[in-house]
Regions:
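FAD-binding subdomain of flavoenzyme oxidoreductases
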Residues: 76-83, 87-221, 425-426
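Activity-critical C-terminal alpha-helical subdomain
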Residues: 400-432
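Glycine-rich N-terminal segment of FAD-binding domains in flavoprotein oxidoreductases
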Residues: 5, 11-74, 349, 383
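Alpha-helix capping/hinge segments and adjacent helical runs
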Residues: 384-396, 421-425
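C-terminal substrate-recognition/cap domain of FAD-linked oxidoreductases
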Residues: 4-11, 181, 185, 194-375, ...
Length: 432
């Protein structure tokens, strides 16, 4: 209860969002979770579900007080079904542990959001995805079934179309207590290609041109040179090109190709190399050894953490826009950020349209906080104008809910009335 509650239960990774629960209930089974929710429903007490607390949108923060239902101890692998190629797990197991278990069995769990220490339940609650969504899709595509606790404390097993009422609902419609995940065969061979370009527009035009062809890349990643340079300086391990032949690179495209064997991957690489002049890239750099591939991904995965450690103030805006609108969104965010005295940098998963826009400053915290609130309204407004979604990969939480449109609010209200009429599950989040 209150006096013994640690600070970790009062926040996630979203800056400026905090809340103090009245109690924390750590559970290890569906039955225990159901009992807690039933008691809270009868008493009208809010329930905020929490996994690892790695969210970026305030989704697991108890902004309305009440009870934090911690699922972190529900971290067991329950069953591997070899015939169905599925893995049944509890929600508190970490993404990296699910991936390792699949790897151990010679299989592959594709969803690959940046935070590997997030829980698998949190991934399902936000429908997390990552760079390889262009080929493999999102978490939703790899959930065969769920066991959930509804807002009245009843339990239910869901599959097929019924999963839509829970996956991506951010703990506002049900508590996920068990997941059966689909595993697939591992890619047998792969390689990474880097394409530096003089500017963002040329880079993204090339990305869309390559996507239109029959190469089926697993990753098509846009990286602007500002973020490449900033991150490389912070980590002391610059990997991606910043200059070529004395000229500053504008942006780099990272492409991952997969195939049945090395020869099939090489064939794709050779076909793409023939397009170098057409797509106006400055060069093509190849990563086809385990060491090079690890270095490329380590440099890419350092973007987020380097913002936090390399600047006095940092914030991220995570959105999704149509692939053909990414260049316009990048230029808009940079211009608006610059007008406010902020340095704005970006990278994006081109195939799925997922964007990570970072703003940093070494100014005063209060001034930065005011500026990034203004910038958020501009970025989210532009995102909607371009036909995108502010949900992105991190969800809405409480950080973005004020920017949702009337249509999204109405749709959510109808679901909330159906599944949680008392409004006890994760109040103040998503469209609540």
């Amino acid at each position: 209860t209150a006096d013994a509650i640690g600070a970790d239960y009062c926040h996630d990774e979203c800056p400026g969002v905090a809340g103090t629960p009245d109690a924390v209930a750590e559970v290890t089974s569906t039955e225990q979770a159901a009992a807690v929710v039933k008691l809270c429903a009868e008493a009208g007490v809010p329930v905020t579900v929490r996994g690892a607390g790695t969210g970026q949108a305030g989704g697991s923060v108890p902004v309305s007080g009440g009870v934090v239902l911690s699922l972190k101890a529900m971290d067991q692998i329950l069953e591997f079904d070899e015939a169905a190629c599925t893995l049944r797990v509890q929600p508190g197991i970490l993404l990296q542990e699910v991936k390792a278990e699949a790897e151990k069995r010679g299989l592959y769990y594709p969803p690959d959001p940046g935070e590997k220490t997030a829980t698998i339940g949190g991934n399902a609650a936000t429908n997390a995805s990552g760079p390889n969504a262009v080929k493999y899709g999102t978490t939703r595509d790899y959930v065969a079934s769920l066991t959930v606790v509804r807002a009245d404390g009843s339990t239910e097993t869901l599959s097929g179309a019924d999963l839509e009422s829970v996956i991506g609902s951010e703990g506002t419609l049900a508590v996920i207590t068990e997941l059966t995940l689909k595993l697939i065969g591992k890619p047998k061979a792969d390689a990474i290609l880097l394409f530096p370009f003089m500017d963002t527009e040329t880079c993204l035009n090339a990305a869309n041109a390559l996507l239109a062809k029959d190469y089926a890349p697993a990753v098509v990643e846009y990286m602007d040179t500002d973020i490449v340079e900033f991150s490389g300086n912070v980590t002391g391990n610059p990997v991606f090109p910043v200059e070529m032949d004395g000229e500053r690179v504008g942006a780099t495209l990272m492409l991952t190709l997969e195939g049945e064997d090395d020869d099939s991957v090489m064939e794709k690489m050779e076909e793409i190399a023939e397009l170098a002049e057409e797509i106006e890239c400055l060069d093509i750099l190849v990563g086809d050894t385990p060491t090079m591939k690890r270095e490329f991904w380590a440099a890419h995965d350092a973007f987020h953490t380097s913002m936090e450690s390399g600047a006095k103030n940092a914030i991220e805006y995570n959105i999704t826009v149509p692939a053909e609108k990414i260049a316009e969104m990048v230029e808009y965010a940079k211009a608006e950020g610059e007008a406010k005295g902020l340095k704005v940098m970006a990278y994006a998963h081109v195939g799925s349209g997922g964007m990570h826009i970072h703003a940093v400053s070494d100014g005063e915290k209060a001034e930065f906080a005011a500026k990034v609130i203004e910038l958020a309204a501009l970025i989210y407004g532009k995102c909607s104008e371009l036909g995108g979604s502010i949900r992105g990969e991190y969800g809405i939480g409480c950080a973005k809910k004020q920017h949702l449109g009337a249509e999204a609010l109405d749709k959510f209200s109808a679901l909330k009335a159906k599944y949680d009429p008392k409004g006890i599950l994760n109040p103040g989040k998503a469209a609540d």
